[in-house]
UniProtKB/Swiss-Prot annotation:
Compartment annotation: Cell membrane
PANTHER family attached to this UniProt entry: K(+)_H(+) ANTIPORTER SUBUNIT KHTT (PTHR30445), TRANSPORT PROTEIN YIDE-RELATED (PTHR30445:SF3)
Keyword Magnesium: no
Protein name in the entry: Uncharacterized transporter DIP0830
GO molecular function terms listed in the Swiss-Prot or TrEMBL record: monoatomic cation transmembrane transporter activity
Membrane topology annotation: Multi-pass membrane protein
Keywords associated with the record: Cell membrane, Membrane, Repeat, Transmembrane, Transmembrane helix, Transport
Ranges that cross the membrane: 4-23, 30-47, 57-79, 91-113, 156-178, 362-384, 389-411, 424-446, 456-478, 516-538
Signal peptide: none
Domain spans labelled RCK C-terminal: 187-271, 273-354
Listed Pfam families: Asp-Al_Ex, TrkA_C
Organism annotation: Corynebacterium diphtheriae (strain ATCC 700971 / NCTC 13129 / Biotype gravis)
Amino acid sequence: MDIFVANPLLALFVIMAVGLAIGQVKIRGFSLGVAAVLFAGVGFAAVEPDIHIPHLVYILGLSIFVYSIGLESGHAFFALFKSQGVKQNALAITALALITGISIALFSLIHLNGVTAAGLFTGAVTNTPAMAAVVDSLPSIFGDANKVHEVESLPLVAYSLAYPIGVLGVIAAIGLCAKWFRIDHVQEAHDAGVAVEDLFTRQIKVNHVVTGSDLVIDIHHTLGLEIIVSRIERDGQQTLPTASSRIHMGDVLSVVGTAEELDKAAHVLGDLLPGDPFHGHDLDYRRIFVSNQDLVGIPLAKLRPRLSGILITRVRRGDHDHVATPETVLQLGDRVRVVAAHDRMKSVTALFGDSYRRLSDFNLFPLVAGLALGLLVGMIEVPLPGGAALSLGSAGGPLVVALVLGAVGRSGRFVWQVPYGANLALRQLGITLFLAAIGTTAGASFRASLSDPASLTIIAVGAIITLTLAIFVLVVGYKVMKIPYGQTAGMLAGIQTHPAVLSYVSAMTKNDLPALGYTSVYPLAMIAKIIAAQVVLFALT
């Protein structure tokens, strides 16, 4: 182990590699995933306590991790507030406030010191940024550097002991409650309109008078369906719909949507026609990769003048296709299905970019500038009685700034978003760096705790906190607030801010309801837990 003591950088990457390898091991369908890196770091440092990874590494990793999450979630987070977001976040904040109060009462009952209690709390709610905020707050409480060094391993040890039950307990609660409530995930997704279905293009002949707006671009609002008209055939000539195009009797519309939505549209408009919508016509379609920064971060409705003679019908982001609407905002790395004349396809392709190489050369300035701004926001302190100070820290600051910038999308020439693939890579790298570095600070103390009977008390109290939070959210969300169970379970995963729980729920439901719930509460839950952990620390220290 001497080689790792003398070479911290080597130790860092070996810990990361070992942890990621262990994280891929599945036992009955469950794996620790990237969280295994934390335990790898603890294990290495338990064997050789002199292994030290520089403090800056975990700060850097944590900041990158939360910033990339905020950028990806920002637009959806603020959009959801216009519909269900307020109700869902009210449940999340109520649950976290309740569990914070219960935790403080439990910790006081067993006479647990504030530093260990705060670490236990962050492990029970599985939030590493909150644990980092606790460590960051220690100097404002103890002042003396030697005292800080003496106690800084305590929250990490308590976190490590409570963390496994924090994950497994929530997963068990979700699975058991699903059986208890007899949830039909297929029917639930269908009722909520989020069943994962393929998109098709079909021809519909207009034989009925359209009630409401007869503008083609308004058809999804007029009919209340997630569809888009990609072409209009009139008197044997096919054209692309424009902002002023209207639906006439006898028109043949090429419509994109799910099979069910297309059947509903045909019932209202007229008759569904057989055949290939593209056969024998001058219009063509193609999937094109978005790498032109000038087109991202702007709703399609505002891009329409630049897209004259072009129609975007579908947007594929990650592994899912979405019907393009006027409100859709493109991101770098999206794959769009466009319809245009044959002879324009070359220029259309050039307009969108269609270049993986160009995408890899994205401007780093907005990324580092946003991170710098986030760290500055995280440094803002709110004084508390007794001389302590509350702050968002290196996790909360970047997250708040990223949420705002992710919702804004772009400022003039600067595109705040990063390509989807790059975002996922940054997120994975950031959390891996953080967990590897933070794990090594607790090794010696963790080894000693394994032979300490008090560790069982920490694990038991952590389990009580985890299960109380899980059952409260599932019962109140599903039974009282009538939120679909899959979405409620996704909200619980978001409140726990743990991707492993989301993966489990998504695999169980096989639809997008968990992702909707997760995205709606994750950012606010992250910030709330960063603050709650410090409240526990200050209340009991």
